[in-house]
Amino acid sequence: MTTVSIIGKGTMGQAIAKVVTAGGNTAELVGREDAGKPLAGDVVVLAVPYPAVADVLAAHREHLAGKIVVDITNPLNFETFDSLTVPADSSAAAEIAAQLPQSRVLKAFNTTFGATLAQGTVGEGGPTTTVLIAGDDADAKATLAGVIEAGGLRAIDAGSLRRARELE
């Protein structure tokens, strides 16, 4: 059994928690009021908007070393909706990985809506929801894929962390 700490109690955080628990794993939902507290999970999901990531990392950095950290953000420029707010040769996940050298950073869940995750299918009776996973650590990807698949969804290895930009 895997324990997954999900930082963010919004729509995505709750949907991911539903997937985690559907597979018999444990989900810990973490909010602002929990800043600085130890995280129970070996897997930590950053289910917050990209502009909030810096504050989340500052509040939890010491508890992220050695953990699998899953970035679900899309660093979209919400003023123009036509570009990302990270450098052209980078991604939100790469920026997070640079700040967390002791963690195994993955990109996942950012191409799927919360409702689709919670429902488990694309539309009523449609195909099983698919979650793309990008990252450089095969064991970390296998751990996350196991949690996703146990929850009834499909997990696909999307390649290295360099692929995160395409997913964003």
Residues covered by each model-derived region:
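NAD(P)+-binding Rossmann beta1-loop-alpha1 motif at the extreme N-terminus of oxidoreductases
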Residues: 1-35
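Residues at the starts of beta-strands that form the adenosine-phosphate
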Residues: 3, 26, 42, 130, ...
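Active-site phosphate/pyrophosphate- and oxyanion-stabilizing loops and adjacent acidic/basic residues
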Residues: 18, 58, 94
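Internal alpha-helical scaffold of NAD(P)-dependent oxidoreductase catalytic cores
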Residues: 99-105, 123-164
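Solvent-exposed alpha-helices and their adjacent loops that cap or buttress functional pockets
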Residues: 37-38, 62, 98, 121-126
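Rossmann-fold NAD(P)-binding glycine/threonine-rich loop
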Residues: 73-122
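Rossmann-like NAD(P)-binding element
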Residues: 28, 35-68, 72-80
